[in-house]
């Protein structure tokens, strides 16, 4: 679940099965993020955006941004920066029970022009400096139908690896 906090008030509370993404729009400047995990500073990023992904979403935007592919049975949350302005910004793998708070900040005294948060690429909300995105494990459980005989790794090989089904 993702919650947007603006001026100490919750403005949105939306679920996401795959990912929650904060990204700049168009030609806006990079965004500064202060990321807290369980109330402790994890890191500060200057980047085009940040992806918070579930294992189910790890083969989508997260993978394209250089994040790891994770088995859907893993109980983790992925944090992947998008085009970070840094020499050492890797994806991080956190526990599914970790509470993630992302603070949107100005970069080097410049004004953030436009940034948005999207939930599974469907619903978008505009963000401003000072806003906080809270990401928590949802209490809702999604039941996913699995075709018998297909393993995660076989499907991964076919869809992401570009191999045909006979291999």
Regions found by a protein language model. Name each.
Residues 1-51, 59-167:
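Catalytic phosphate-donor-binding core of small-molecule kinases
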């Amino acid at each position: 679940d993702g919650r947007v906090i603006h001026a100490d008030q919750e403005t949105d509370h939306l679920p996401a099965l795959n990912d929650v993404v904060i990204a700049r729009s168009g030609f806006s400047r990079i965004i500064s993020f202060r990321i807290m995990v369980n109330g402790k500073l994890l890191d500060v990023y200057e980047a085009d955006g940040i992806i918070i992904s579930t294992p189910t979403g790890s083969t989508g935007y997260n993978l394209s941004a250089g994040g790891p592919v994770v088995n859907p049975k893993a109980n983790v949350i992925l944090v992947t920066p998008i085009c970070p302005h840094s020499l050492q910004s890797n994806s991080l793998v956190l526990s599914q029970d970790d509470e993630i708070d992302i603070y949107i900040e100005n970069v080097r005294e410049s004004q953030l022009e436009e940034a948005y948060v999207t939930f599974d690429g469907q619903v978008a909300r505009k963000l401003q400096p000072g806003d906080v995105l809270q990401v928590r494990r949802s209490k809702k459980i999604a039941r996913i139908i699995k075709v018998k005989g297909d393993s995660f790794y076989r499907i991964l090989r076919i869809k992401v690896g570009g191999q045909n089904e006979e291999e």
